């Protein structure tokens, strides 16, 4: 079974070879460019961050999807929250999220980031990072595999391609 990206490339090459030009909508081009040039900022808080590093290594190679890790929130448009979020770290998470450029997306990685995980009943743990920032994609697991993270990123790319216009208006921010 062929990947969806390869089917799109075949369709594009067939159109160009048959007609010599391509007709499309500006919204589709913007969605394609945004989805294929994500710049994630790591927010690794616990053991899930190790799996995130593995997904960026040569075996899985997130670079082939156009993703380039950025050290600064002002240069990134995707935040990957990986690990247990504590009450003390929650204001820092929100501050980093507010510094990111628009449009911005959040991927919650692992049981702890999704809902508190193993430490759910602890007094010091936030029961899901979606209480602090709006989350676009949840990746389950403890810890989730690198394949699960790649799949979550591909789902986020599909979501980004469905958005229209220059302003990201698919959800309300807090």
From Swiss-Prot:
[4Fe-4S] cluster binds at residues 47-48, 112, 142. It comes from the Bacteria. GO terms for molecular function: 4 iron, 4 sulfur cluster binding; iron ion binding; NADH dehydrogenase (ubiquinone) activity; NADH:ubiquinone reductase (non-electrogenic) activity; quinone binding. Its cofactor is [4Fe-4S] cluster. The keyword Metal-binding applies. GO terms for biological process: aerobic respiration; electron transport coupled proton transport. It is an enzyme of class 7 (translocase). It is a peripheral membrane protein. It catalyses: a quinone + NADH + 5 H(+)(in) = a quinol + NAD(+) + 4 H(+)(out). InterPro entries: NADH_UbQ_OxRdtase-like_20kDa, NADH_UQ_OxRdtase_20Kd_su. It is found in: Cell membrane. Belongs to the complex I 20 kDa subunit family. This is NADH-quinone oxidoreductase subunit B. It comes from Rickettsia africae (strain ESF-5). The lineage of its organism: Bacteria, Pseudomonadati, Pseudomonadota, Alphaproteobacteria, Rickettsiales. The gene is nuoB.
